[in-house]
Amino acid sequence: GRKMPFSVYLPKSYDGQKEYPVLYLLHGADGNHNDWMAQGMLNPYASAAEAAGGKEMIIVCPNGSPDGQNIFYCDNYQGNNMKYMTYFFDEFIPYVESNFKVKAGRGTRAIAGLSMGGFGSLYYSFLHPEMFCYVYACSPATAIEGAPNLYEMLGTKDLPGITIEIGKGDFLFGSANSFKQALDGSGIANEYITRDGIHDWAFWKGCLPKLLKKVSDTFEE
C-alpha cells in the first residue's frame, strides 16, 4: 500500500505508438531512483548512445531503498518484512509494461546496476533467467549477509549474457574476482572488465557507454 517512485528515460522518438526494449537500471546502497539520472548523467549518455547508432530503449530506474533502507533488492532482507523482490516481479515490471510502450519479452528486457544494484541485477537474472537477455553488474556486491547466496545459484541453466565491470582500487575487487572464478568454474560464460578506478560515480559513469552498447547489441530487433 505504499507509493514507490521511479525514474524513466524515454527515447527521443517516443510517441506512445512504437514499442521499445527496456533496461532496468538499479542504484546502489544509500541511493534512490534519481541516482543514475542526477549523478550518473544517464540522459546525455543514453542520448549519445542513440546518436552513435545504438538501439533506442526505455530505461527504468526503480527505488530500491524504500524508507531509506538498503534492502539489496530481495525479500525479507536481514529479517525485515519488506518483500521487494516479489514487488519487482509481480507489480513493478507489469506496471512498467502496461504504462509505457515496452516490447515485452526476454529478448528485449535487460537489467543492470551498481554495487548493491549490481548484486540485485545478478540476483534477479539468476532467479529469473527467462526474463532477461543480459545483465551488466558494475562494482557488484556478490556476497551479502542476510541476502540470497549467489554462489548457490550458479547451477541455474540458460542464464543471460553477463558482464561484470569493477575498478582495481574498489574495496569489492577481491570478492568480484572470486565470483568471476566461480562463474568460470561453473562453466558460465561471462565478460569481466577491470580498469583503474574505485567505488565511485566517476567509475560508474565510465561504465555507461559500454553498458548501453552491450545491452543494445544484445536486444532482439
Model-derived features: where do they sit?
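Non-catalytic cap/lid and distal C-terminal segments of serine-dependent acyl enzymes
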Residues: 1-221
